């Protein structure tokens, strides 16, 4: 296995692990619409368009 492929493999594994993390850890969520953000966060959603919001489930200040 060449070094390039090894780095790519490690990158894929690491990114998958980041997505799995839960339990009150702030994680960026890519949201294109208010509805996208509402899937992850309760409370009022303000102008969530084409950016990443830091939020955890239940955080009213998602975007």
UniProtKB/Swiss-Prot annotation:
Record family assignment: Belongs to the DEFL family.
Coiled coil: none
Disulfide pairings: 31-48, 37-53, 41-55
UniProt entry keywords in alphabetical sequence: Antimicrobial, Disulfide bond, Fungicide, Plant defense, Secreted, Signal
Record's subcellular location: Secreted
Domain of life of the native organism: Eukaryota
GO biological process, one term: defense response to fungus
Signal peptide (residue range): 1-15
Organism of provenance: Arabidopsis thaliana (Mouse-ear cress)
Transmembrane segments: none
Protein name, UniProt field: Defensin-like protein 278
Gene Ontology cellular component annotations, sorted alphabetically: extracellular region
């Amino acid at each position: 296995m060449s070094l390039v492929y090894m780095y790519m493999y490690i990158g894929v594994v690491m990114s998958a692990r980041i997505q799995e993390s839960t339990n009150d850890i702030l994680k960026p969520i890519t949201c294109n619409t208010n509805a996208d953000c509402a899937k992850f966060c309760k409370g009022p959603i303000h102008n969530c368009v084409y950016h990443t919001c830091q939020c955890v489930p239940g955080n009213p200040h998602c975007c």
